């Protein structure tokens, strides 16, 4: 693709993202995959250039849509202009290139300058300002700038670490070891790993270092009975199986059959065989979970949340979040915490996790739970992140170079009579 054709592709995808944000439709990565699946002539460099520019636009969506009236052409023009890349060389009207500027668009371009309001400069919805400032305090600017950067590709070593490093060195792939989790490898190059033998054969999995560290604090051991109540595609379950050395049982629950199918594929690839998976529905949920009442040594509870800690890799999430949906998440989280508590045995532990930086979803939920359950004891986690409820862990991009992630470990004690 010629450079001007790439810009035309970005305009088309920007329009699709705008529609998707308005209708709560598919995520940007889904739209990009679909777009290029019907354009086989586009090479890997084309896809990378288009995707990178599109995601730069998504990060600044609030500001760009405000100044452009949500017009996709103007949003792309403005992003190019603000990046010191002259848009006039792309908008030529040539074959496969965007049409020439209209007089109105030329006038618009002359008015474009960097955002002056804080929520425009730091790329967050205005209504979230107090929550973000409450969380980050005097590190607000540093943390928000970190959330605006692209996240690196982080891998978890599943097995055979020497083979992994040998492969990376042989392929001249730049990497460094994680700082917080021994299992983490951070890839410095922009790569596609789906065809790597070490990935296809289950030696590595894609997982942010924060999530790897969170599983470490669950203190898993061989032979335990473990429930993953919101398993999804099984990232944390697979990490748990490694700590358990394939001994014991992991019961993976989710409301999505497709996600659990992914877990089964990944488990086979990683040579883990201690999984049982269960699809939960409104009809079977109570009865199915009732079968596990007070039988679990550990419950991993990575609850649905705002995803505010993942804005580096999912920048559109900041624009999808609505005030009412945050309240819904909080109610869902409390319901799931009760279900997890019913499943864990006396002396067992629930590991509450979110990929959020908001106190409403993190410390406030733990404080509520401790008040509601007199037999719940908060097991202290050594402080490694930013300011937080004593005994819990809150990681963030600036403080620790990871996704924003929260962990609290709750131990179930016998009720005193």
Write out the residue ranges for each language-model feature.
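Class I Rossmann-like S-adenosyl-L-methionine
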Residues: 1-194
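Glycine-rich S-adenosyl-L-methionine
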Residues: 129-130, 255-262, 317-345
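SAM-dependent Rossmann-like transferase core, predominantly class I methyltransferases
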Residues: 187-225
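Conserved class I S-adenosyl-L-methionine
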Residues: 223-230, 251
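Conserved SAM-binding loop of SAM-dependent methyltransferases across substrates and taxa
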Residues: 233-246
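Helix-to-beta-strand junctions that scaffold the AdoMet/dcAdoMet cofactor pocket
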Residues: 244-245, 344-346
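S-adenosyl-L-methionine
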Residues: 256-294
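C-terminal catalytic and target-recognition region of SAM-dependent MTase-like enzymes
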Residues: 283-306, 312, 327, 334, ...
């Amino acid at each position: 693709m010629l450079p001007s054709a790439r810009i035309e592709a970005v305009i088309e995808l920007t329009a699709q993202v705008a529609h998707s944000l308005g209708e709560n439709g598919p995520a940007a990565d889904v739209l990009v995959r679909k777009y290029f699946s019907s354009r086989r002539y586009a090479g890997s460099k084309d896809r990378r250039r288009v995707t990178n520019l599109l995601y730069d636009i998504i990060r600044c969506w609030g500001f760009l849509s405000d100044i452009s009236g949500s017009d996709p052409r103007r949003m792309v023009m403005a992003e190019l202009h603000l990046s010191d890349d002259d848009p006039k060389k792309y908008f030529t009207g040539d074959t496969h290139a965007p049409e020439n500027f209209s007089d109105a668009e030329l006038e618009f371009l002359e008015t474009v300058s960097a955002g002056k309001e804080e929520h425009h400069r730091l790329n967050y919805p205005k209504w979230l300002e107090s929550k973000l400032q409450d969380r980050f305090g005097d590190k607000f600017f540093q943390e928000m700038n970190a959330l605006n950067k692209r996240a690196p590709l982080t891998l978890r070593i599943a097995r055979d670490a020497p083979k992994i490093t040998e492969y990376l060195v042989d392929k001249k792939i730049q990497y460094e070891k994680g700082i917080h989790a021994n299992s983490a490898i951070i890839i410095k190059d922009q790569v596609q790993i789906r065809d790597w033998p070490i990935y296809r054969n289950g030696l590595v999995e894609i997982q942010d270092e924060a999530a790897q560290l969170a599983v470490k604090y669950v203190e898993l051991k061989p032979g335990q009975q473990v429930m993953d109540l919101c398993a999804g595609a099984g990232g944390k379950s697979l990490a748990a199986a490694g700590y358990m050395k394939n001994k014991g049982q992991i019961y993976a629950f989710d409301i999505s059959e497709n996600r659990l199918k992914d877990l089964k594929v990944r488990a086979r690839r990683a040579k883990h065989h201690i999984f049982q998976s269960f699809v939960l529905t409104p009809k079977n949920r109570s009865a199915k979970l009732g079968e596990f009442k007070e039988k679990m040594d550990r419950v991993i509870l990575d609850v649905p949340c705002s995803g505010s800690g993942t804005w580096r890799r999912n920048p559109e999430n900041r624009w999808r979040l609505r005030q009412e949906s945050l309240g819904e998440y909080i109610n869902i989280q409390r319901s799931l915490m009760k279900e997890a508590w019913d499943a864990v045995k006396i002396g067992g532990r629930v590991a509450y996790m979110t990929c959020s930086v908001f106190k409403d979803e993190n410390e406030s939920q733990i404080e509520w739970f401790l008040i509601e359950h007199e037999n719940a004891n908060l097991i202290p986690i050594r402080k490694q992140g930013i300011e937080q409820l004593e005994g819990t862990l809150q990681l963030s991009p600036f403080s620790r170079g990871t996704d924003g992630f929260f962990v609290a470990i709750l131990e179930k004690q016998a009720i005193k009579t």
